[in-house]
Structure formats: C-alpha cells, structure tokens
Amino acid sequence: MAATAAEAVASGSGEPREEAGALGPAWDESQLRSYSFPTRPIPRLSQSDPRAEELIENEEPVVLTDTNLVYPALKWDLEYLQENIGNGDFSVYSASTHKFLYYDEKKMANFQNFKPRSNREEMKFHEFVEKLQDIQQRGGEERLYLQQTLNDTVGRKIVMDFLGFNWNWINKQQGKRGWGQLTSNLLLIGMEGNVTPAHYDEQQNFFAQIKGYKRCILFPPDQFECLYPYPVHHPCDRQSQVDFDNPDYERFPNFQNVVGYETVVGPGDVLYIPMYWWHHIESLLNGGITITVNFWYKGAPTPKRIEYPLKAHQKVAIMRNIEKMLGEALGNPQEVGPLLNTMIKGRYN
C-alpha cells in the first residue's frame, strides 16, 4: 500500500481542500482529533484512473472523487429526508460519549457482565429529528447516531433517488471483482464529532459520503496484532479493544507499532473499504450533521485452489474460524481463552 499511496500524495489525500464554489477550504486540521500513531494518505483518484482500478483489484483503499454513485442523494438533508423517507422505524443509538462502539445484542448472553456503551431505540424519522434538535438546543453530553438499512418503507422520492444511483458503475465493479451480492445499503446520520471506533467487516464496502465530512483512518489486516480485537464470542466482536484517545500500552503494547491510512471524505466522495481492513470513522468536530450510505457486498467465493503464502485477511478468517469451532466444541465461549493459552503458552514463543 505504501508505494501506491505515495504515488497519489500529489492529489491532496490528507490536506484540507477547497470545494467547487466554496469560500476557502471545506474543513481544517482543528476539526480532527489527535492520536498517538502516524498515518499515510489514502489516494484520491478519478474512477477512470488505472491506478484506482489497480488498488481495488488488490483490495487496497482508495477515494474515488467522480463516480456519481449517489449523485441524486447529494440534496439530502434532514428536512428533505423527514418529508420523504416514509413512516418506517429507524434504529437510533444514543450515548453519553462521542464513541459509538458497535455491539451484537445476540451475543450479550455470552458475557453477562457486559454493559453496552450506547443504547438502541426504534423511532420514526421525525422523532429522531425532534430529539436531535432538542439535544442541540439544550446542550449536554448526549449524542445520537441513526444507523438503518434502507428498505421498502421509504417514500417515493427516496426510491427515485435510489434508482438514480450509478448502478451501472458499481455493478461493473462487483462483476469485475467476482464479489457476491449486494447485502445492504446502510444509511448513517451522525452528529458532529461522533466516532465509530476501529473495527473490521467481513464484507466489501463502498462508503459513499452525502453530507458533511468524515475522517476515515484505515489499517490493513496485517496489523491485527496491533489492534487487539475482542474475542469472536464477545458482543463487540471485530472491534478493537484499544481506546485511541488514551491507549493502555501495558495491556496493548503492539499498538505502539500501528500505522494508519487516512483521508477525509466529503459530499460525492466514495471510499473503497476492503474486506477485513480496520476502519475508524469520525464526523469532523464542529462540522454539522453527516450523512453516509454504505454499499456492502459479500466477498468473492474462496478459490478452489489456495495460493500460498496466505494473505493477511485469509489468516484473520482462519483465526475467527478456530475461535468459533472451539466455542462450539467446548460448549462454553468462556473456555476458549484458557484453552488457547494452555495450547500456546511457553510452546511457541
């Protein structure tokens, strides 16, 4: 990744940039949180640039500046969505901090002492807007983050916008890569300063920014040992245990070696987040509401002939499968860690 990223530094991957018709830069460094680790810029390229195709083919991140993937949605704001999105239910998370750590409610029974750091509530879109405006008016620490898969409850205008997405381009990407089906389009509406802590997904993702600006810091799968994910059976599976704001280097010493790949995406930008790449996402400080739509695809089928040496993401998949199988064989997820320690301690190091 380093070589290809270096080629694209000239395109301004990590610098505040001026938008067409804007007076000055769209954002500045004061809107970014400070962290202890170094980062390199993610390339910003035209979708017609051969280097962009090469990066996607190699499963490396790239920001595509001109796909027009979600062009009809660039007019979306809270008012437009409230008028047109329909009367369906939306999942809205609330937290007393800026961090929204994902958790799987189905796995909470495995860890009885687990307490989620955010609460999920189902509400109508107008209720979300009213609650958001109330929080903004009275101040305080409470934050909201709407995260909802787009479905058939949306209104006609949203359907028309959705049909106007550049499906021709994205379907070609899917076909060229041999990916599986589109599994979902996740709508994300966040308050300024909201953070989704570092995690990885087991799907390919085109992350399309619609409103506002988001900073995205990615880490390749080979930095797994630096990011210390929760156990597979934990509700926060696939999430890093490291607090980026205040890293505990005694518990997580390898985090000192982590190196990120960074960009800020704005309206119309599409970030390719490869499967198994860690990503930390933050809505810029003092940047207003952000709106994003994810395009999640299943990965390509496992090739019949495995090539060695295995790639880092394949090793992550193997580790996940080992944890899952041990949990099933032992009948108790709590026994997985002690058994792995018994197997490895003093034998392989």
Swiss-Prot record:
Binding site for Fe cation: H199, D201, H279
Effect listed in the UniProt record for changing H199A: Prevents suppression of HIF CAD activity. Strongly stimulates 2-oxoglutarate turnover. No stimulation of 2-oxoglutarate turnover
Main location: nucleus
Residue numbers bearing the N-acetylalanine modification: A2
Keyword Oxidoreductase carried by entry: yes
UniProt entry keywords in alphabetical sequence: Acetylation, Cytoplasm, Dioxygenase, Iron, Metal-binding, Nucleus, Oxidoreductase, Transcription, Transcription regulation
Region (Interaction with VHL): 2-125
Domain of life assignment: Eukaryota
Pfam families for the chain: Cupin_8
Composition bias type Low complexity, residue spans: 1-10
Cofactor(s) it depends on: Fe(2+)
This enzyme's EC code(s): 1.14.11.30, 1.14.11.n4
Enzyme class, broadest EC rank: oxidoreductase
Effect in UniProt of substituting Q239H: No effect on Asp hydroxylation ability
Residues that hold substrate according to the record: D152, Q181, L182, T183, D201, E202, Q203, R238, Q239, A300, N321
Gene Ontology BP terms: negative regulation of Notch signaling pathway; negative regulation of transcription by RNA polymerase II; positive regulation of myoblast differentiation; positive regulation of vasculogenesis; regulation of vascular endothelial growth factor receptor signaling pathway
SMART domains: JmjC (SM00558)
Residues of the JmjC domain: 142-312
Record GO cellular component, one term: nucleoplasm
Function: Hydroxylates HIF-1 alpha at 'Asn-803' in the C-terminal transactivation domain (CAD). Functions as an oxygen sensor and, under normoxic conditions, the hydroxylation prevents interaction of HIF-1 with transcriptional coactivators including Cbp/p300-interacting transactivator. Involved in transcriptional repression through interaction with HIF1A, VHL and histone deacetylases. Hydroxylates specific Asn residues within ankyrin repeat domains (ARD) of NFKB1, NFKBIA, NOTCH1, ASB4, PPP1R12A and several other ARD-containing proteins.
Designated name of the protein: Hypoxia-inducible factor 1-alpha inhibitor
